């Protein structure tokens, strides 16, 4: 799996990453590639493709605070990605969905465990959890 280094683009709006995903999925030059990249995003609300935005989002409040709303290509719920939040994309061309999730997310979990062990081992007492929300394009 290839990793795309997008740091040269800096923090972007969600639309940049959604367009990049769509381009990679449809462009002939990427047809056989399996890719991973991290999104460094500006604050936004991101809704899954099947969500009713008006049911998920307090529209009056969102307009008041000026946070943009985006609809992603994949399913899943609605999230608020605040300052410092990052998202990630895995693009795999083959395999059963559950196997792909297990394989890809296990590497993310391993990375978080390493970060926690390296940087936070003396900061926390007790248990803590890291949660990942995922979606897929069928």
What are the functions of these language-model segments?
Residues 45-48, 80, 138:
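Short hydrophobic-aromatic micro-motifs
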């Amino acid at each position: 799996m290839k990793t795309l280094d997008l740091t040269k683009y800096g923090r972007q709006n969600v639309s940049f990453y959604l367009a990049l995903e769509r381009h990679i999925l449809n462009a002939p030059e990427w047809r056989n590639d399996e890719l991973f990249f991290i999104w460094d995003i500006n604050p936004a609300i991101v809704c899954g493709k099947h969500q009713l935005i008006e049911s998920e989002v307090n529209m009056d409040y969102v307009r008041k605070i000026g946070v943009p709303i985006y609809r992603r290509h994949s399913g899943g719920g609605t999230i608020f990605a605040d300052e410092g939040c990052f998202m990630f994309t895995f693009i795999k061309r083959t395999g059963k969905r559950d196997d792909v999730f297990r394989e890809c997310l296990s590497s993310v979990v391993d990375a978080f465990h390493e970060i926690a062990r390296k940087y936070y081992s003396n900061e926390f007492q007790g248990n803590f959890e890291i949660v990942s929300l995922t979606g897929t394009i069928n």
